[in-house]
């Protein structure tokens, strides 16, 4: 029997982030309008019929259009979700930006893990202190219970920190998938 489980992680205080998202878009429109007006005023016609150049208008256009671009990028990050899926011992992690753009982050087989457990445990500290370890924190809620997975992939060592719900936790952290030397905690029963 195949075991498939999927979890979508969203922010707990979503109303605040939605308010920030719309505030970013209001500021983005204002910055874009000011930047475009700066573009229109770069070149002007003088009283004698000759063309003139306004460097201040060019600078204003660059600053405000750049600000609009940065606000657009920031607004996409305000609506970030993480998608965790577990299929027969293979764990996949993806990030979804603004409900549209899905980015694959990593995939690992649970049987290939070197260590796993709760963040902050002794095993976590040991893995985090090793040299050359890439630490990935793919969670949204700082107060949530977080778990780490330590594995080697393509010659690089990775320490991934995720926030799992109870169902995902029970499915992954049992003897069927994790051996005793890997799991830093009590086994869960399915």
Write out the residue ranges for each language-model feature.
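Membrane-cytosol interface motif
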Residues: 85-103
